UniProtKB/Swiss-Prot annotation, chain B:
GO terms for cellular component: membrane; mitochondrial inner membrane; respiratory chain complex III. Its cofactor is heme b. It comes from Caenorhabditis elegans. Heme b b562 binds at residues 80, 179. This is Cytochrome b. InterPro entries: Cyt_b/b6_C, Cyt_b/b6_C_sf, Cyt_b/b6_N, Cytb/b6-like_sf, Cytochrome_b_N_euk/bac, Di-haem_cyt_TM.
C-alpha cells in the first residue's frame, strides 16, 4: 500500500516535470522567434556557399571572379586596407598575375624630392584607397563614408548571406517611404535606406573566364572574394582541423586504455568478510 | 619510502600520496582542465603580446596585422579568443559541480575559487577591450562608468582608469598592462587554491571516515586527468572549424567614438550578470545587484556545517539555479522590450532567491541532526 502510493506520486511528479519542461521550451522557442523577428530589416536567406561546410574550401575560381568585380565596381569607392597584392600570390593568382594586377594600380607616393607622385603598384603595396581620408570619402558620398571592405564579410550579421542579399536586394521603395537623392531603398539594410545605390547589373562587367556576368553571379563572386579577403587562412584552418580530428580517436584509445590499466587493480577489488579465529561474534545466550 | 627533503615531502603529500576517494568522477576533471586552459591562455597571450600595440590609432590594425601578416598569428588569436570561452565553460561547470557536492564546506578553497572567478572576469573583460572594436570600446565605456557609483572616490577612480575624461588610447594602455599582469597573479592564487584543496582532498559523494579505504592521488587520478587532452583536441578542432561563432560581428569593426552600435551586449559568459544589471532601473542598485550575484556565494564560507547534506534537496535547488542562470544569460542578449523587461527582474529575483535558499538550508540543516 505504502509503496503503491509512493510510486503513484513519483509518476505524477514525473509527468508534471515533463509538462513543465515542455511548456518552458515552448515559451523559449516563441520568445526566440520574436527576438529574431525584431529589428528593422529583412533577414537574409541562408545560401549554399561552396565554403560553408566544416571541411569545405573556397571556390577559388569564384574568388578570382570576385576580385574582378571588386576591381571594376567596388574599388571606385571602397578600400581594402589590410590586403596587399602579395596576398594574392599562390593563393588566387600566380606571381606574374599578381604583379600585373599591382602594376595596373596607381599608388600615391612621394619621390626623392619629396613631391607627391602616382606610380604603378608592386606586390608589397596595399590595394589602393580611392580617397585620401574618411572625411573626403564622406563628402563625396552624401555624407556616408564607404566602409573598408577588408573584413566586411565577418563584420556584418549574416556574413556572406547578408552581402549577397544586400547587393541583389534593391527594389522600388514602397509607398510612403521617402528616399533622398543619391540614396536607395534596400530592405536588407538596417533602416531600409542605404547610401550605396545599386552597383551590380546583368553584364555590367565581363569576366575573363567567360562566365556569364549576371547580377547574381557577380554578387556571389564578390561575396566569396570578400570572405576570402577577411579570412585568407580559411582553407588552412579547415585542413588542420581535419588532420587533428583524425588524430582524436587514436589519442582517446590510448588515454582510455592507460587510465583503465592504472585503475584495473582498484576497479577489480573484492571485499571478503570472514571470521578471524579468536574474534568470533558472541554466541547467542 | 620517505624522503628527507621537506619541500619534496610537501609536494609528494599533495600530488602523489594524497588519499583520495575512489568515487571522484569526470566532474572532478574540470579543475585540472581549467589549469591546462589557463597555462594555454598565458602562452598564447604572451605570443600575441609580441605584436600588439595598445595605441588607439593602431590597436585594431595590429590585431589585423597579427591575423594577416604574422606567421600563424591567426592561429594564436583564434586559440586565445576561443580559449577564453573554453575557460568559462569549464569554470561554470566547475562552479556547478561545487554547488552539487557542497564544496563550500572547504572554506579556503571556496573563497580562493570565488576570488579567481572575479579576477578571471576582469581579465576577460580587459581582453575584450584590447581588440578595440566597436563592441570593445563601448563595453569599456559602459562598464568603467559603473565604477562611478562608488561613494566619494568613484569619479576619481573612473578618471584614473580612463587616464583622462573619456575612454581613450591611454585607457587602452592601462588595460593592456593589467591584462598582461593579472594572469600571473591568477596563476599564484590558483596554486594557492590547489594547495588548499589538496590539504584536505576533494569533497565527494561517498562519505568515508578516515583514510583507510582510499587510493593515492597518483597514478590513479593523474591517469584520469589525462582525459583532458581529448577535450583539448576537440576544442582545437572546433576552434579551427568555427573560429568566430562565439563572437559578435561588431568585433571586426574598428572602434568609432562618434557612433555606437545599435545593441551593446557582452560576451556570452557575462550575459547573466548583464541581465541582472539591466533588470534594475537604478544605476546604484543595479551595480550592487551585479556585484551580489557573485559575492553572495562568499557567504556560504561563513557557515560551519561539514556533514549535514540534504543531497536530494540540494540537487533539486542546484538544477533550478542552473536553469535560472541559463535563462538569465538568454535574457541578457535579448533587446530591451516587452516581455523581456518583465522577465529579467523575475528571473533575477529567482536567481537570488535560490542562492539565498541554498544558503539558508546549508545553515539550517545542521540543526536537523542535533
Amino acid at each position: 500500500m505504502q509503496r503503491a502510493v509512493v510510486q503513484g506520486s513519483k509518476r505524477g511528479l514525473a509527468a508534471l516535470a515533463g509538462v513543465t519542461a515542455a511548456s518552458g521550451m515552448g515559451l523559449v522557442y516563441a520568445l526566440e522567434n520574436s527576438v529574431s523577428a525584431s529589428g528593422d530589416n529583412v533577414h537574409p536567406y541562408a545560401l549554399p556557399w561552396a565554403h560553408s561546410g566544416p571541411f569545405s574550401s573556397f571556390d577559388i575560381a569564384s574568388v578570382r571572379r570576385g576580385y574582378e568585380v571588386y576591381k571594376q565596381v567596388c574599388a571606385a569607392c571602397h578600400s581594402m586596407k589590410f590586403l596587399h597584392y602579395r596576398h594574392f600570390v599562390d593563393t588566387i593568382m600566380t606571381e606574374e598575375e599578381a604583379k600585373a594586377e599591382a602594376a595596373d594600380a596607381l599608388i600615391n607616393d612621394v619621390d626623392d624630392k619629396g613631391a607627391s607622385i602616382q606610380r604603378p603598384g608592386m606586390l608589397t603595396d596595399k590595394l589602393p584607397n580611392p580617397y585620401p581620408n574618411k572625411k573626403a570619402a564622406a563628402a563625396a558620398n552624401n555624407g556616408a563614408a564607404p566602409p573598408d571592405l577588408s573584413l566586411m564579410a565577418l563584420a556584418r550579421h549574416g556574413g556572406d548571406d547578408y552581402v549577397f542579399s544586400l547587393l541583389t536586394g534593391y527594389l522600388e521603395a514602397p509607398a510612403g517611404v521617402k528616399v533622398d537623392d543619391g540614396k536607395a531603398y534596400n530592405p536588407y539594410f538596417p533602416g531600409g535606406i542605404i547610401s550605396m545605390p545599386q552597383q551590380l547589373f546583368d553584364e555590367g562587367i565581363e569576366y575573363k573566364d567567360g562566365t556569364p556576368a549576371t547580377m547574381s553571379q557577380q554578387a556571389k563572386d564578390v561575396s566569396a572574394f570578400m570572405h576570402w579577403a577577411a579570412e585568407p587562412f580559411h582553407d588552412t584552418r579547415k585542413k588542420w582541423a581535419l588532420k587533428i580530428a583524425a588524430l582524436i580517436p587514436f589519442v582517446a584509445v590510448v588515454l582510455i586504455y592507460g587510465k583503465r590499466h592504472i585503475w584495473s587493480f582498484t576497479k577489480s577489488q573484492k571485499f571478503l568478510f570472514k571470521t578471524v579465529k579468536g574474534r568470533e561474534p558472541p554466541k547467542a545466550q | 619510502m620517505k624522503i628527507n627533503n621537506s619541500l619534496l615531502n610537501f609536494v609528494n603529500g599533495m600530488l602523489v600520496t594524497l588519499p583520495s576517494s575512489k568515487t571522484l568522477t569526470l566532474s572532478w576533471n574540470f579543475g585540472s582542465m581549467l589549469g591546462m586552459v589557463l597555462i594555454f591562455q598565458i602562452l598564447t597571450g604572451t605570443f600575441l603580446a609580441f605584436y600588439y600595440t595598445p595605441d588607439s590609432l593602431m590597436a585594431f590594425s595590429t590585431v589585423q596585422y597579427i591575423m594577416y601578416e604574422v606567421n600563424f598569428g591567426w592561429v594564436f588569436r583564434i586559440f586565445h579568443f576561443n580559449g577564453a570561452s573554453l575557460f568559462f565553460i569549464f569554470l561554470y561547470l566547475h562552479i556547478f559541480k561545487g554547488l552539487f557536492f557542497m564544496s563550500y564546506r572547504l572554506k579556503k578553497v571556496w573563497m580562493s575559487g570565488l576570488t579567481i572567478y572575479l579576477l578571471v572576469m576582469m581579465e576577460a573583460f580587459m581582453g575584450y577591450v584590447l581588440v578595440w572594436a566597436q563592441m570593445s570600446f563601448w563595453a569599456a565605456v559602459v562598464i568603467t562608468s559603473l565604477l562611478s557609483v562608488i561613494p566619494i572616490w568613484g569619479p576619481t577612480i573612473v578618471t584614473w582608469i580612463w587616464s583622462g575624461f573619456g575612454v581613450t588610447g591611454a585607457t587602452l594602455k592601462f588595460f593592456f598592462v593589467l591584462h598582461f599582469l593579472l594572469p600571473w597573479a591568477i596563476l599564484v592564487i590558483v596554486l594557492g587554491h590547489l594547495i588548499f584543496l589538496h590539504s584536505t582532498g576533494s569533497t565527494s559523494s561517498l562519505y568515508c571516515h578516515g583514510d583507510y579505504d582510499k587510493v593515492c592521488f597518483s597514478p590513479e587520478y593523474l591517469g584520469k586527468d589525462a582525459y583532458n587532452i581529448v577535450i583539448w583536441l576537440l576544442f582545437i578542432v572546433l576552434s579551427l572549424i568555427y573560429p568566430f561563432n562565439l563572437g559578435d560581428a561588431e568585433m571586426f569593426i574598428e572602434a568609432d567614438p562618434m557612433m555606437s552600435p545599435v545593441h551593446i551586449v557582452p560576451e556570452w559568459y557575462f550575459l547573466f550578470a548583464y541581465a541582472i544589471l539591466r533588470a534594475i532601473p537604478n544605476k546604484v542598485l543595479g551595480v550592487i545587484a551585479l556585484l551580489m550575484s557573485i559575492v553572495t556565494f562568499y557567504f556560504f564560507a561563513l557557515v560551519n556545517n561539514y556533514t549535514s547534506c540534504l543531497t536530494k534537496l540540494n540537487k533539486f535547488l542546484v538544477f533550478m539555479f542552473i536553469i535560472s542562470s541559463t535563462i538569465l544569460s538568454w535574457l541578457g542578449q535579448c533587446t530591451v522590450e516587452d516581455p523581456f523587461t518583465i522577465l529579467s527582474p523575475l528571473f533575477s529575483f529567482i536567481y537570488f532567491g535560490l542562492a539565498y535558499l541554498m544558503l539558508f538550508i546549508f545553515m539550517s540543516s545542521k540543526l536537523l541532526f542535533k
